[in-house]
Amino acid sequence: MKIFTHRSKLMYLAIFLMIFDSFRPLLFSLDTSLYLSIVGRIVYPILLFLFADSFYHATNKKKIMIGLLLLSWLLSLGYGLIDHFIVPIGWQNYENIFMTLLIVAMFNVGTDYLRKYRKQLGRKNYILRFQGIGMILLPFILSFLVFEIGMFFLKPTFSKAIVYYIVGAVMLMLPSLFVVHTGVMMVILGWLFYIFRKRRGIQYLLILVYSIFSFLLHPYSLQWTMVFSIIAIHFCHREKKTWPPV
């Protein structure tokens, strides 16, 4: 289990596999792609777990978030080039792991502000409270903005080409919930990993509960296979390393 003790290597491997998982449907047949998706299902919770621990110890969270935003734009550019020159994807099907981590980071920063507010002694600084709530609500506000822009350009007065490129560009540039990898629930899972960072048993329980519900609701989606990520997470030593790992 030596690989699981090297958090930096595991972090890079998880990111690479998640990017691979994003392009997987374009590279393989439907049957092969379905079975390969198991890798992404298992790696995703591991990445969220490592991100929660690393982000907590990071000294410059703002720099991390800017880096994630730039990486998300770079990945979106890759999607756009493939969509235009190789295989039509459609921006509706884009899944951006870096944008997902950015939104998780926004929730985490909001949580930090609220924790600082709660720990204050004497007169409370309500600015921290508003900053915390604002950071948590910001992804939802931006998602609503993206939705409204999309509805505006869907009017018959605009051509389909304008709608496709403008709405697609806005959706891919702004941190919205429309392009998160595997859905909003995984963002919430990553946020809960951060909240319960020191309670590994609760983290295991979160993965287990999510896997059970996924199996009961959609057994053929293979999302439930993420339960096996608990094995890898169990052998991850809690080393205090910042994000990105060095």
Please place each PLM-identified region on the residue numbering.
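Alpha-helical transmembrane segments and their immediate juxtamembrane cytosolic regions
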Residues: 1-246
